[in-house]
Amino acid sequence: MVQNRCYRVHSKVSLPPRRPFEKERMDRELKMCGKYGLKNKQEIWRLQYYLARARKTARHLLTLPEDDMKRQFEGAALLRRMTRLGLLDESKQQLDYILSLKTEDLLERRLQTVVQKLGLSKSIHHARQLIFQRHIRVGKQTVNVPSFIVRVDSEKHINMSPFSALVQGGKPGRMTRKKLKSQKSE
């Protein structure tokens, strides 16, 4: 029998809802899935868990006195992280604003949504397919994860991959290669 010697401790990345059949929440999640082109509700729960942890940290830091070193240091780091992700503006640099963040704010920063808003795709579902099929890159890195959270400074570097068959002068697609092969054999 083969023994596994590489044990890993995985932390939780999402939490299912406490009440599984709450009608208002289910309708709200279904609308979000349609609007943002999500595969399933697990993607919503993952982002909600991320925001819940950020809010929990902010609430803990707000209980500390203003001049506490931990509050200043960790609070500044949390605000910097949220600003870099585009969740907070430069004008909203206080821990109170982290408590008012919504899931939709984080859904707006997903690569799938940003690609659609930049006009690189025809629809939100088309954006998901382009990302999965490796037609989109961020900077010099090809990204094939639709849930990739786009930073503010990376947003201007999102474009079509030069190796994509959809780009003029890119690698030819499967049918184009087949036609070229049949023309050569004739």
UniProtKB/Swiss-Prot annotation:
Transmembrane segments: none annotated. The keyword DNA damage does not apply. The keyword Ribonucleoprotein applies. Residues 167-186 are annotated as: Disordered. InterPro entries: Ribosomal_uS4, Ribosomal_uS4_CS, Ribosomal_uS4_euk/arc, Ribosomal_uS4_N, S4_RNA-bd, S4_RNA-bd_sf. One of its GO terms (molecular function) is structural constituent of ribosome. It comes from the Eukaryota. GO terms for biological process: ribosomal small subunit biogenesis; translation. Gene3D superfamilies: RNA-binding S4 domain (3.10.290.10). Belongs to the universal ribosomal protein uS4 family. This is Small ribosomal subunit protein uS4. It comes from Naegleria fowleri (Brain eating amoeba). The gene is RPS9.
